[in-house]
Amino acid sequence: MAGLPTNSNVLERQRLEQQRQEQQRIDALKHFGQLFKQRQIEPSADARAHWQQVLQLGFPGSKHEDWKYTPLERLFAHEFSFPHAPDVTTAQCDALSLVPNAHRLVFINGQFSPTLSDRECGPYQLTHAAENVPFPTAIQSEVFLHLTESLAQERLHIRLPVGQHSDKSLYLLHISSGNDSDMVNTSHS
C-alpha cells in the first residue's frame, strides 16, 4: 500500500530524532564549556574537578530514568551568559521584597550584595567561602549539580547554630536582570 508509513520509516525518523537530541546535548556541553572558560576568576581545583564531572556524565537523554519526563531540549535551546550586575537601589529592594519583617540578604544575578542586605542578621552566621575551600560532599551527584558548582564564582555559607532560634525569618531576595534577547543569564557571577 503506497503512502502508508512502514516500520523502517518510523524507525528512521526515531533514529534521526535521537541523533538530533544527542547533537543538541553535545552543543550544550560545548557552550557551557565556553562559559566555564569565561569565568571572571581563575577556577579552583574544586571547580575544575566539577567541570570534569560534567564532561564525564554529559547531559541526560530521554532514556535516563531520572530525566525521561523532563524536556531538556527546551533548556538547551537557550544561550546562557554571565550577566552584568545592574545598579539596584535600596528603595528598589524594598519595593520588591515580599517579606517586610525578616533578616534580608540580597543577591543580584546570583552575587551577594552586602550593601543592599541587612547588616544585622540575628543569630544567622554568614561566611564568604574562598575559592580554595572545598565544596561539601554532594548528597546525590548529578550533572546539574556539577555544572552549578563549576560555574559558581562566589559562595556564601549561611548557618544557624544548633540550639539557636531567630525571632525573624531569613529572607533571600534574588534579583535577576534580563533583556529582550533569547539569552539566559546564569546566576553565578
Please give the residue ranges for each predicted region.
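Glycine-rich and polybasic anion-binding loops at the starts of cofactor/ligand-binding domains
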Residues: 2-189
